[in-house]
Amino acid sequence: MSADVRDILDMERANTPEVTRDSFLATKKRNFERTKTASRRPEGMHREVFALLYTDKKDAPPLLPTDTALGIGAGYKETKARLGMKKVRKWEWAPFSNPARNDSAVFHHWKRVTDNSTDYPFAKFNKQLEVPSYTMTEYNAHLRNNINNWSKVQTDHLFDLARRFDLRFIVMADRWNRQQHGTKTVEELKERYYEVVALLAKAKNQTSEKKVFVYDVEHERRRKEQLEKLFKRTTQQVEEENMLINEMKKIEARKKERERKTQDLQKLISQADQQNEHASNTPSTRKYEKKLHKKKVHQQPRPSRVDSVVNAIEIGSSGIKFADLRGSGVSLRSQRMKLPANIGQRKVKALEQAIQEFKVDPAPPPTEDICTSFNELRSDMVLLCELRTALSTCVYEMESLKHQYEAACPGKTLNIPPSLVPIKTEALDNSTN
Protein backbone atom coordinates (compact mmCIF):
# COMPACT_ATOMS: atom_id res chain seq x y z
CA MET A 1 0.00 0.00 0.00
CA SER A 2 2.78 2.40 0.87
CA ALA A 3 4.62 1.45 -2.36
CA ASP A 4 1.59 2.37 -4.52
CA VAL A 5 1.28 5.75 -2.81
CA ARG A 6 4.95 6.44 -3.47
CA ASP A 7 4.51 5.52 -7.20
CA ILE A 8 1.57 7.94 -7.54
CA LEU A 9 3.52 10.77 -5.94
CA ASP A 10 6.69 9.92 -7.95
CA MET A 11 8.65 9.29 -4.77
CA GLU A 12 11.52 6.88 -4.36
CA ARG A 13 10.68 3.51 -2.98
CA ALA A 14 12.15 2.36 0.29
CA ASN A 15 14.66 -0.49 0.28
CA THR A 16 12.37 -3.40 1.09
CA PRO A 17 13.26 -7.04 0.76
CA GLU A 18 12.08 -8.75 -2.38
CA VAL A 19 8.97 -10.83 -1.94
CA THR A 20 9.60 -14.38 -3.00
CA ARG A 21 7.57 -17.52 -2.97
CA ASP A 22 9.31 -18.86 0.12
CA SER A 23 8.90 -15.68 2.07
CA PHE A 24 5.27 -15.40 1.04
CA LEU A 25 4.44 -18.95 2.01
CA ALA A 26 6.59 -18.67 5.19
CA THR A 27 8.27 -21.99 4.58
CA LYS A 28 11.30 -20.98 6.62
CA LYS A 29 11.08 -20.84 10.37
CA ARG A 30 10.99 -17.42 11.90
CA ASN A 31 13.37 -16.66 14.72
CA PHE A 32 11.26 -15.38 17.56
CA GLU A 33 13.20 -13.86 20.39
CA ARG A 34 12.07 -14.96 23.77
CA THR A 35 10.63 -12.12 25.75
CA LYS A 36 12.65 -11.55 28.80
CA THR A 37 10.62 -11.54 31.98
CA ALA A 38 11.99 -9.02 34.41
CA SER A 39 12.14 -10.37 37.95
CA ARG A 40 10.49 -8.07 40.41
CA ARG A 41 11.79 -7.38 43.90
CA PRO A 42 9.53 -8.97 46.54
CA GLU A 43 7.78 -6.69 48.96
CA GLY A 44 9.66 -6.17 52.21
CA MET A 45 13.06 -7.12 50.75
CA HIS A 46 15.75 -4.46 50.73
CA ARG A 47 17.25 -3.40 47.44
CA GLU A 48 20.77 -4.39 48.49
CA VAL A 49 19.69 -7.94 49.41
CA PHE A 50 17.81 -8.30 46.10
CA ALA A 51 20.93 -7.17 44.21
CA LEU A 52 22.99 -9.85 45.96
CA LEU A 53 20.50 -12.61 45.14
CA TYR A 54 20.03 -11.73 41.46
CA THR A 55 22.91 -11.20 39.02
CA ASP A 56 23.04 -8.86 36.05
CA LYS A 57 21.47 -11.54 33.85
CA LYS A 58 18.48 -11.59 36.21
CA ASP A 59 18.97 -15.24 36.97
CA ALA A 60 17.09 -16.72 39.89
CA PRO A 61 19.19 -17.59 42.96
CA PRO A 62 20.27 -21.24 43.25
CA LEU A 63 18.43 -23.50 45.64
CA LEU A 64 21.71 -25.09 46.80
CA PRO A 65 25.20 -23.55 47.06
CA THR A 66 27.35 -24.46 44.07
CA ASP A 67 30.93 -23.99 42.95
CA THR A 68 31.23 -23.02 39.31
CA ALA A 69 35.01 -23.14 39.14
CA LEU A 70 34.86 -25.97 36.56
CA GLY A 71 32.32 -24.20 34.38
CA ILE A 72 28.63 -23.47 34.37
CA GLY A 73 26.65 -26.51 35.36
CA ALA A 74 29.66 -28.40 36.67
CA GLY A 75 28.34 -28.33 40.25
CA TYR A 76 30.85 -29.04 42.99
CA LYS A 77 34.50 -29.55 42.20
CA GLU A 78 34.34 -33.23 43.11
CA THR A 79 30.85 -34.47 42.46
CA LYS A 80 31.92 -38.10 42.43
CA ALA A 81 34.48 -40.10 44.30
CA ARG A 82 37.39 -40.64 41.96
CA LEU A 83 38.14 -44.23 42.77
CA GLY A 84 41.09 -45.95 41.20
CA MET A 85 42.88 -42.70 40.37
CA LYS A 86 45.62 -43.15 42.99
CA LYS A 87 47.49 -46.07 44.42
CA VAL A 88 45.99 -47.58 47.56
CA ARG A 89 47.94 -46.82 50.73
CA LYS A 90 48.74 -49.79 52.93
CA TRP A 91 47.78 -50.00 56.59
CA GLU A 92 49.02 -52.37 59.26
CA TRP A 93 47.95 -53.52 62.73
CA ALA A 94 50.83 -52.18 64.83
CA PRO A 95 51.51 -52.30 68.57
CA PHE A 96 52.05 -49.20 70.68
CA SER A 97 52.55 -48.28 74.34
CA ASN A 98 51.33 -45.31 76.34
CA PRO A 99 54.22 -43.55 78.12
CA ALA A 100 51.76 -42.28 80.75
CA ARG A 101 51.35 -45.82 82.08
CA ASN A 102 53.93 -47.55 84.27
CA ASP A 103 52.72 -51.14 83.82
CA SER A 104 54.33 -51.61 80.36
CA ALA A 105 50.95 -52.37 78.79
CA VAL A 106 51.00 -52.94 75.02
CA PHE A 107 48.04 -51.97 72.81
CA HIS A 108 47.40 -52.21 69.06
CA HIS A 109 45.91 -49.87 66.47
CA TRP A 110 45.85 -49.34 62.72
CA LYS A 111 48.48 -47.06 61.19
CA ARG A 112 49.94 -46.43 57.76
CA VAL A 113 52.99 -48.34 56.68
CA THR A 114 54.69 -45.13 55.60
CA ASP A 115 54.18 -43.60 59.06
CA ASN A 116 57.51 -44.18 60.79
CA SER A 117 56.76 -42.16 63.93
CA THR A 118 57.22 -44.26 67.04
CA ASP A 119 55.92 -41.75 69.61
CA TYR A 120 52.36 -42.04 70.80
CA PRO A 121 50.54 -38.95 69.40
CA PHE A 122 48.51 -38.39 72.57
CA ALA A 123 51.52 -38.49 74.88
CA LYS A 124 51.81 -34.69 74.70
CA PHE A 125 48.60 -34.39 76.73
CA ASN A 126 50.16 -36.25 79.66
CA LYS A 127 50.88 -33.21 81.83
CA GLN A 128 51.94 -34.01 85.37
CA LEU A 129 52.25 -31.61 88.27
CA GLU A 130 55.54 -31.19 90.07
CA VAL A 131 54.98 -32.49 93.58
CA PRO A 132 58.03 -31.82 95.78
CA SER A 133 59.81 -34.63 97.55
CA TYR A 134 61.83 -34.71 100.76
CA THR A 135 64.41 -36.91 102.41
CA MET A 136 64.48 -38.31 105.91
CA THR A 137 67.00 -35.66 106.95
CA GLU A 138 64.79 -32.82 105.64
CA TYR A 139 61.75 -34.28 107.36
CA ASN A 140 63.51 -34.55 110.72
CA ALA A 141 64.93 -31.04 110.39
CA HIS A 142 61.90 -29.10 109.11
CA LEU A 143 58.70 -31.19 108.96
CA ARG A 144 58.59 -33.22 112.14
CA ASN A 145 57.20 -30.53 114.43
CA ASN A 146 53.68 -29.49 113.37
CA ILE A 147 50.56 -28.28 115.14
CA ASN A 148 48.22 -31.06 114.00
CA ASN A 149 50.68 -33.88 114.92
CA TRP A 150 51.07 -35.37 111.48
CA SER A 151 53.37 -38.40 111.41
CA LYS A 152 55.84 -39.23 108.66
CA VAL A 153 53.71 -42.16 107.49
CA GLN A 154 50.68 -39.93 107.10
CA THR A 155 52.71 -37.27 105.28
CA ASP A 156 54.19 -39.89 102.93
CA HIS A 157 50.72 -41.24 102.18
CA LEU A 158 49.46 -37.70 101.51
CA PHE A 159 52.21 -36.94 98.99
CA ASP A 160 51.77 -40.34 97.34
CA LEU A 161 48.09 -39.54 96.75
CA ALA A 162 49.06 -36.06 95.48
CA ARG A 163 51.32 -37.61 92.81
CA ARG A 164 48.77 -40.25 91.83
CA PHE A 165 45.76 -37.94 91.51
CA ASP A 166 47.45 -34.63 90.49
CA LEU A 167 46.40 -32.66 93.60
CA ARG A 168 42.71 -33.42 93.21
CA PHE A 169 42.02 -33.11 96.91
CA ILE A 170 38.42 -34.31 96.66
CA VAL A 171 39.63 -37.60 95.16
CA MET A 172 42.55 -37.73 97.59
CA ALA A 173 40.15 -37.42 100.55
CA ASP A 174 38.04 -40.23 99.10
CA ARG A 175 41.10 -42.49 98.62
CA TRP A 176 42.57 -41.71 102.03
CA ASN A 177 43.27 -44.85 104.07
CA ARG A 178 41.10 -44.23 107.11
CA GLN A 179 41.85 -47.56 108.76
CA GLN A 180 45.59 -46.94 109.03
CA HIS A 181 45.83 -43.14 109.17
CA GLY A 182 42.50 -42.03 110.66
CA THR A 183 39.90 -39.69 109.18
CA LYS A 184 41.08 -36.49 107.50
CA THR A 185 38.97 -33.81 105.86
CA VAL A 186 39.77 -32.01 102.63
CA GLU A 187 40.77 -28.86 104.53
CA GLU A 188 43.21 -30.82 106.72
CA LEU A 189 44.82 -32.44 103.66
CA LYS A 190 45.22 -29.07 101.96
CA GLU A 191 46.60 -27.44 105.09
CA ARG A 192 49.26 -30.12 105.61
CA TYR A 193 50.27 -30.26 101.94
CA TYR A 194 50.75 -26.50 101.51
CA GLU A 195 52.48 -26.30 104.88
CA VAL A 196 55.05 -28.90 103.78
CA VAL A 197 55.52 -27.20 100.39
CA ALA A 198 56.15 -23.82 102.06
CA LEU A 199 58.65 -25.28 104.56
CA LEU A 200 60.57 -27.13 101.83
CA ALA A 201 60.70 -24.03 99.63
CA LYS A 202 62.00 -21.98 102.56
CA ALA A 203 64.61 -24.61 103.42
CA LYS A 204 65.81 -24.85 99.79
CA ASN A 205 65.72 -21.05 99.26
CA GLN A 206 63.13 -21.33 96.48
CA THR A 207 60.78 -18.62 97.74
CA SER A 208 62.18 -16.02 95.33
CA GLU A 209 61.72 -18.23 92.25
CA LYS A 210 58.05 -19.07 92.73
CA LYS A 211 55.46 -17.56 95.01
CA VAL A 212 54.31 -19.97 97.70
CA PHE A 213 50.56 -20.42 98.07
CA VAL A 214 49.27 -19.61 101.56
CA TYR A 215 46.22 -21.68 102.51
CA ASP A 216 43.89 -20.20 105.15
CA VAL A 217 42.10 -23.20 106.59
CA GLU A 218 39.89 -21.20 108.97
CA HIS A 219 38.62 -18.98 106.17
CA GLU A 220 37.85 -22.04 104.04
CA ARG A 221 35.91 -23.69 106.86
CA ARG A 222 33.87 -20.56 107.51
CA ARG A 223 33.17 -20.23 103.81
CA LYS A 224 31.84 -23.78 103.57
CA GLU A 225 29.76 -23.34 106.71
CA GLN A 226 28.18 -20.21 105.26
CA LEU A 227 27.48 -21.97 101.97
CA GLU A 228 25.91 -24.87 103.82
CA LYS A 229 23.69 -22.53 105.83
CA LEU A 230 22.75 -20.71 102.65
CA PHE A 231 21.84 -23.99 100.98
CA LYS A 232 19.73 -25.17 103.92
CA ARG A 233 17.54 -22.08 104.08
CA THR A 234 13.80 -22.63 104.18
CA THR A 235 11.28 -20.99 101.90
CA GLN A 236 10.18 -18.61 104.65
CA GLN A 237 13.76 -17.48 105.23
CA VAL A 238 14.29 -16.83 101.52
CA GLU A 239 11.08 -14.78 101.34
CA GLU A 240 12.07 -12.81 104.44
CA GLU A 241 15.49 -12.05 102.95
CA ASN A 242 13.90 -10.85 99.70
CA MET A 243 11.53 -8.66 101.70
CA LEU A 244 14.44 -7.12 103.62
CA ILE A 245 16.30 -6.46 100.38
CA ASN A 246 13.27 -4.68 98.93
CA GLU A 247 12.91 -2.59 102.09
CA MET A 248 16.57 -1.65 101.91
CA LYS A 249 16.10 -0.52 98.30
CA LYS A 250 13.13 1.61 99.36
CA ILE A 251 15.17 3.20 102.15
CA GLU A 252 17.96 4.00 99.72
CA ALA A 253 15.46 5.53 97.29
CA ARG A 254 13.98 7.72 100.05
CA LYS A 255 17.47 8.77 101.10
CA LYS A 256 18.32 9.82 97.54
CA GLU A 257 15.04 11.73 97.35
CA ARG A 258 15.85 13.62 100.56
CA GLU A 259 19.31 14.44 99.25
CA ARG A 260 17.81 15.73 96.02
CA LYS A 261 15.36 17.93 97.93
CA THR A 262 18.21 19.25 100.08
CA GLN A 263 20.16 20.18 96.96
CA ASP A 264 17.12 21.94 95.53
CA LEU A 265 16.74 23.87 98.76
CA GLN A 266 20.41 24.88 98.70
CA LYS A 267 19.95 26.16 95.14
CA LEU A 268 16.88 28.10 96.23
CA ILE A 269 18.74 29.64 99.17
CA SER A 270 21.69 30.59 96.97
CA GLN A 271 19.33 32.23 94.48
CA ALA A 272 17.71 34.14 97.33
CA ASP A 273 21.16 35.28 98.52
CA GLN A 274 22.01 36.55 95.05
CA GLN A 275 18.70 38.35 94.73
CA ASN A 276 19.23 39.85 98.19
CA GLU A 277 22.65 41.18 97.17
CA HIS A 278 21.20 42.58 93.96
CA ALA A 279 18.26 44.17 95.73
CA SER A 280 20.39 45.69 98.50
CA ASN A 281 21.50 48.51 96.19
CA THR A 282 17.99 49.70 95.30
CA PRO A 283 16.48 52.83 96.95
CA SER A 284 13.56 50.88 98.40
CA THR A 285 15.97 48.54 100.10
CA ARG A 286 17.94 51.38 101.59
CA LYS A 287 14.76 52.90 103.05
CA TYR A 288 13.77 49.50 104.38
CA GLU A 289 17.20 49.05 106.02
CA LYS A 290 16.97 52.51 107.60
CA LYS A 291 13.60 51.62 109.12
CA LEU A 292 14.96 48.37 110.48
CA HIS A 293 18.00 50.16 111.85
CA LYS A 294 15.81 52.68 113.69
CA LYS A 295 13.60 49.98 115.18
CA LYS A 296 16.45 47.66 116.14
CA VAL A 297 19.29 49.91 117.19
CA HIS A 298 20.42 47.80 120.09
CA GLN A 299 19.84 44.44 118.41
CA GLN A 300 22.56 42.82 116.32
CA PRO A 301 21.07 39.72 114.65
CA ARG A 302 23.39 36.93 113.58
CA PRO A 303 23.63 36.69 109.77
CA SER A 304 22.46 33.40 108.32
CA ARG A 305 21.08 31.99 105.10
CA VAL A 306 17.60 31.70 106.55
CA ASP A 307 17.61 35.41 107.41
CA SER A 308 18.69 36.22 103.87
CA VAL A 309 15.81 34.19 102.50
CA VAL A 310 13.31 35.96 104.80
CA ASN A 311 14.71 39.38 103.88
CA ALA A 312 14.50 38.48 100.20
CA ILE A 313 10.85 37.56 100.63
CA GLU A 314 10.09 40.79 102.50
CA ILE A 315 11.87 42.88 99.90
CA GLY A 316 9.96 41.29 97.05
CA SER A 317 12.10 38.49 95.67
CA SER A 318 10.10 35.71 94.05
CA GLY A 319 10.67 32.00 93.61
CA ILE A 320 8.84 32.07 90.25
CA LYS A 321 9.92 34.29 87.40
CA PHE A 322 6.82 35.31 85.45
CA ALA A 323 7.07 36.43 81.84
CA ASP A 324 7.14 40.15 81.17
CA LEU A 325 4.57 40.85 78.42
CA ARG A 326 4.85 44.63 78.36
CA GLY A 327 7.03 44.83 75.26
CA SER A 328 5.59 41.88 73.36
CA GLY A 329 2.70 43.67 71.68
CA VAL A 330 -0.99 43.46 72.44
CA SER A 331 -1.88 40.77 74.99
CA LEU A 332 -4.45 40.03 77.64
CA ARG A 333 -3.62 41.07 81.18
CA SER A 334 -4.66 37.62 82.39
CA GLN A 335 -1.67 36.15 80.52
CA ARG A 336 0.58 37.78 83.12
CA MET A 337 -0.85 35.43 85.77
CA LYS A 338 -0.11 32.32 83.70
CA LEU A 339 2.53 30.07 85.26
CA PRO A 340 5.79 29.69 83.30
CA ALA A 341 6.35 26.44 81.40
CA ASN A 342 9.66 25.69 83.15
CA ILE A 343 7.96 24.90 86.48
CA GLY A 344 7.80 21.22 87.31
CA GLN A 345 4.60 19.33 87.99
CA ARG A 346 5.56 18.84 91.63
CA LYS A 347 5.75 22.58 92.25
CA VAL A 348 2.47 23.10 90.42
CA LYS A 349 0.71 20.55 92.65
CA ALA A 350 2.26 22.04 95.79
CA LEU A 351 1.13 25.50 94.69
CA GLU A 352 -2.43 24.26 94.09
CA GLN A 353 -2.53 22.67 97.55
CA ALA A 354 -1.25 25.89 99.14
CA ILE A 355 -3.92 27.93 97.32
CA GLN A 356 -6.59 25.56 98.61
CA GLU A 357 -5.09 25.63 102.11
CA PHE A 358 -5.14 29.43 102.36
CA LYS A 359 -8.51 29.64 100.55
CA VAL A 360 -7.25 31.94 97.82
CA ASP A 361 -9.23 32.48 94.64
CA PRO A 362 -7.29 30.59 91.92
CA ALA A 363 -8.56 32.95 89.16
CA PRO A 364 -9.00 36.50 90.52
CA PRO A 365 -9.97 39.44 88.29
CA PRO A 366 -6.84 40.42 86.31
CA THR A 367 -6.45 44.04 87.27
CA GLU A 368 -3.02 45.67 87.36
CA ASP A 369 -2.60 45.49 91.14
CA ILE A 370 -4.18 42.06 91.47
CA CYS A 371 -1.88 40.57 88.80
CA THR A 372 1.24 41.85 90.54
CA SER A 373 0.09 40.85 94.02
CA PHE A 374 -1.19 37.44 92.90
CA ASN A 375 2.11 36.60 91.21
CA GLU A 376 4.08 37.66 94.29
CA LEU A 377 1.75 35.62 96.51
CA ARG A 378 2.21 32.47 94.45
CA SER A 379 5.96 32.99 94.39
CA ASP A 380 5.98 33.23 98.19
CA MET A 381 3.79 30.11 98.39
CA VAL A 382 6.32 28.14 96.35
CA LEU A 383 9.11 29.29 98.64
CA LEU A 384 6.97 28.36 101.67
CA CYS A 385 6.44 24.85 100.31
CA GLU A 386 10.17 24.46 99.79
CA LEU A 387 10.88 25.60 103.34
CA ARG A 388 8.26 23.22 104.69
CA THR A 389 9.85 20.35 102.80
CA ALA A 390 13.27 21.29 104.17
CA LEU A 391 11.86 21.52 107.70
CA SER A 392 10.26 18.07 107.49
CA THR A 393 13.55 16.70 106.17
CA CYS A 394 15.42 18.20 109.12
CA VAL A 395 12.87 16.77 111.56
CA TYR A 396 13.24 13.35 110.01
CA GLU A 397 17.03 13.60 110.22
CA MET A 398 16.87 14.62 113.89
CA GLU A 399 14.59 11.70 114.72
CA SER A 400 16.84 9.25 112.88
CA LEU A 401 19.91 10.61 114.68
CA LYS A 402 18.06 10.30 117.97
CA HIS A 403 17.24 6.64 117.32
CA GLN A 404 20.84 5.97 116.23
CA TYR A 405 22.16 7.59 119.40
CA GLU A 406 19.79 5.60 121.63
CA ALA A 407 20.69 2.37 119.81
CA ALA A 408 24.43 3.07 120.16
CA CYS A 409 24.15 4.14 123.81
CA PRO A 410 21.56 1.94 125.57
CA GLY A 411 19.94 3.52 128.58
CA LYS A 412 20.56 7.09 127.39
CA THR A 413 18.06 9.45 125.81
CA LEU A 414 18.90 12.30 123.46
CA ASN A 415 16.91 15.37 124.45
CA ILE A 416 16.18 17.68 121.54
CA PRO A 417 15.61 21.34 122.50
CA PRO A 418 11.99 22.45 122.05
CA SER A 419 13.14 25.31 119.84
CA LEU A 420 14.32 22.82 117.22
CA VAL A 421 11.11 20.76 117.21
CA PRO A 422 8.26 22.22 115.12
CA ILE A 423 4.89 22.60 116.82
CA LYS A 424 2.67 21.51 113.94
CA THR A 425 4.51 18.47 112.65
CA GLU A 426 1.37 16.83 111.27
CA ALA A 427 0.50 19.89 109.22
CA LEU A 428 3.99 19.94 107.80
CA ASP A 429 3.83 16.28 106.88
CA ASN A 430 0.47 16.74 105.19
CA SER A 431 1.72 19.72 103.25
CA THR A 432 4.83 17.93 102.04
CA ASN A 433 2.86 14.84 101.04
Curated annotation (Swiss-Prot):
Q: Does the keyword Transcription regulation apply?
A: yes
What's one GO BP annotation on this UniProt entry?
negative regulation of transcription by RNA polymerase II
Choose one Gene Ontology CC annotation of this protein and give it: cytoplasm
Write one Pfam family the protein is assigned to. DMAP1
UniProt GO molecular function = transcription corepressor activity
* Compartments reported by the entry: Nucleus; Cytoplasm
Q: Which residues form a coiled coil?
A: 186-281
Q: Where is the signal peptide?
A: none
| Region called Required for nuclear localization, residue ranges | 1-204
List the keywords (alphabetical): Activator, Chromatin regulator, Coiled coil, Cytoplasm, Immunity, Nucleus, Repressor, Transcription, Transcription regulation
| Loss of function: phenotype | RNAi-mediated knockdown is larval or pupal lethal. RNAi-mediated knockdown in adults results in reduced expression of the antimicrobial peptide genes DptA and Dro in response to septic injury with Gram-negative bacteria E.coli. Adults infected with the Gram-positive bacteria M.luteus display increased expression of the antimicrobial peptide gene Drs.
Give the residue ranges for region: Disordered.
252-305
Q: How does it assemble?
A: Interacts with Rel. Interacts with akirin and Bap55.
The record's PANTHER family line, in alphabetical order, gives:
DNA METHYLTRANSFERASE 1-ASSOCIATED PROTEIN 1, DNA METHYLTRANSFERASE 1-ASSOCIATED PROTEIN 1 FAMILY MEMBER
- According to UniProt, the name of this protein is DNA methyltransferase 1-associated protein 1
* Source organism of the structure: Drosophila melanogaster (Fruit fly)
